[in-house]
């Protein structure tokens, strides 16, 4: 709606006021337009309400009705883009406000209600309900009352052995380093430490040497509890840990290492008397509860702070998305991951559901274990659902009880294939980061979107999508020094506003790293935003689409290239099973040229001509990958995300890469084998890229 039409409506409202008529019908029409995505109507609505005639009839006059009719008549001939989602927007907003009120009631309790209280509540209400099932070699389960009793035993043992050292200083933490095979024991100790008010850092069990030492130090841990199977990892750094007065324990019944005590026998013999809440009475909502390590720009992990408030918020997402007490949740993600620990295990504690923990993800065993345990909710990240779709089809693919899938990183093509093959499973895709202060949620199930917003939600969780410099990874600014918003549908760097009720807690012991994630003066002087480091787009309908991590996006021929977009295009080819796109530097060229590491589908061969025709049809020239690397398998992280850093370092050097390499040949209209002479021509600048 143009500015002149808006001014006409404003004059109409003022005319109604002057005639002593109630302007409510026209004002409500303006409010409807604003809700559907016309924010300038909010200003007009406010002006109209200021002129409301206090002494007038409450019954609308015919003139007011005409004003309302004219307002609605000025809507576009085609409904606004967000109109069809209006009922879901309203329902989600009310649900969000309802959960917010419940959350505030818990916030106002002294001491605040934490996940430990949720465990004790479930143990009293449903003592014999199975809380946790561990698959794999452990193959055990534990009820609510048993889990609460084991955690009480752990609390009493650690309190006695440490002589209150942990709880006397709330800055101290405990660190847990375990393999997935020790899940029940580790979680019992974790909950026991929480009963003492002690924050816990979960460390990746693959950490060794300096990264392990750095993780323990940066978390501020005074206690390290280690899986006996990780003896070698511990002994490499034990002298330095002991020199720093860090108490080390094995989560087993014997200790082969001098200076390290075994906890197993003491845990078995300890009393299971309830731990008084007074031992954790000093904690606040903002107190650290858990440290989750995230990768840093320096290569060393950083301990992101999850406060008790943040833990309750994230763990309640399970309930928010429809998980019930009679559900069984299948969690294949590691406990040192936010989704695996907080959303999965602690989320089940909040709602009273059973959590089935697998030691690791297995595409071949996934559905068999779901059927065996009666799973109704599954959690995913990254490539998990794509791996399930890549398994050969089976007659029993749709024979299961799964009704909900929750997670992030699901591509649109995999979304469709997953639901077509395994049935109408409701997918809750969301976006967020461990240290982030705001998350997004695709609450309407719109394929490919990571979240949705509306005019009201944008007020509740303010954000900005802004232009950025791909080389410096910093937001671009205008002449006044403010960030420059992007147009709808254009990729932009996501910034989320830091407010009192949406704080950024940062990383423990690293104020410089924390400050590096903040951006000031984004829209006005004095405001503060969290830099997610992620590139997203927001379409006209209000849906967010993930484009790339800022570090993965690269620039070629003066254009920004989204690796995620190129991966989606290449993945649609039938002879490619897995695709990982990245940018590599070329001598004498500015920016990076596109390259893709691929895994061929079973029984398929590489077709250079078909690939050439496909990328030329679906990708702009600057986004077309010029090099292809065929691998037997693509390397992934522990959270099932593709690894790009090593591939970028190796580039397309035929001297160090044993995998088959191909290069785009525009003259032959194909991808041909990259031979040493062609490689030399590329490096010398005589091959036209």
From Swiss-Prot:
It is found in: Endoplasmic reticulum membrane; Microsome; Cell membrane. Liver-specific (at protein level). In liver expressed in a periportal distribution. It is a multi-pass membrane protein. SUPFAM superfamilies: Acetyl-CoA synthetase-like. Keywords: ATP-binding, Cell membrane, Endoplasmic reticulum, Fatty acid metabolism, Ligase, Lipid metabolism, Lipid transport, Membrane, Microsome, Nucleotide-binding, Transmembrane, Transmembrane helix, Transport. GO terms for cellular component: basal plasma membrane; endoplasmic reticulum; endoplasmic reticulum membrane; protein-containing complex. Pfam families: AMP-binding, AMP-binding_C. Its EC number is 6.2.1.7, 6.2.1.3, 6.2.1.-. One of its GO terms (biological process) is long-chain fatty acid metabolic process. Disruption phenotype: Mice exhibit a severe bile acid conjugation defect. Display a significant reduction in both liver lipid uptake and content and show a redistribution of lipids away from the liver to other tissues. Hepatocytes show significantly reduced long-chain fatty acids (LCFA) uptake. The keyword Cytoplasm does not apply. It is an enzyme of class 6 (ligase). AMP binds at residues 292-303. PANTHER family: LONG-CHAIN FATTY ACID TRANSPORT PROTEIN, LONG-CHAIN FATTY ACID TRANSPORT PROTEIN 5. This is Long-chain fatty acid transport protein 5. It comes from Mus musculus.
